[in-house]
């Protein structure tokens, strides 16, 4: 059969089979350490489409980045590296990542993981810088101070600045809030 010939050449023909293999291996590796892979069907489908012979590898996140919010870690890993997040179910913290190689590496994945961890550290250094910078700005000026410069940022040449866009969203939020049994003032604050 064609699929068997491909398998002998290290190609899994069916993307669903690749996805199942990736998910099984990822969750098994995480479970062995008492961790959980954060479900992400879109990323799983994307990664299954990128590899022919998936080999799941688990890497570590540098200790300097473990205090970042889970959302910051997940976004950096998912969007830029196509990594799955692995969390500690007791703390909810993202502690590791899963990457998928496109063939069985000779060294068991050591070199791949070393390279991926180096690239991830650079990405997370940037994320940490922006996160800490935003926190400093909020502490100094409050949340409303974050939006002060948005009047100088064009949203669209026919729709005005980002500040005008936010004002329109706040007006809409205040209008919709009572329909959802939400305090209009809180909706306005959330919109800003």
What is the meaning of each model-derived region?
Residues 1-192:
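Amphipathic alpha-helical "coupling" segments that flank catalytic cores
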């Amino acid at each position: 059969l064609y699929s068997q010939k491909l398998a002998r050449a290290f190609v899994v023909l069916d993307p669903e089979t690749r996805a199942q293999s990736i998910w099984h291996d990822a969750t098994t590796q995480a479970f062995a350490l008492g961790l959980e892979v954060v479900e992400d069907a879109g990323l799983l489908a994307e990664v299954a489409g990128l590899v022919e012979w998936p080999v799941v590898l688990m890497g570590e996140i540098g200790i300097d980045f473990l205090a970042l919010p889970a959302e910051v870690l997940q976004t950096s890993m998912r969007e830029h590296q196509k990594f799955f997040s692995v969390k500690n179910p007791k703390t909810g913290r993202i502690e590791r990542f899963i990457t998928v190689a496109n063939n069985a590496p000779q060294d068991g994945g050591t070199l791949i993981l070393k390279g991926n961890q180096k690239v991830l550290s650079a990405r997370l250094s940037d994320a940490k810088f922006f996160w800490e910078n935003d926190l400093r700005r909020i502490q100094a000026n409050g949340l409303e101070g974050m939006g002060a410069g948005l009047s100088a940022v064009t949203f669209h040449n026919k729709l005005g600045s980002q500040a005008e866009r936010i004002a329109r969203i706040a007006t809409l939020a205040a209008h919709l809030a009572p329909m959802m049994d939400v305090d209009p003032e809180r909706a306005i604050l959330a919109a800003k």
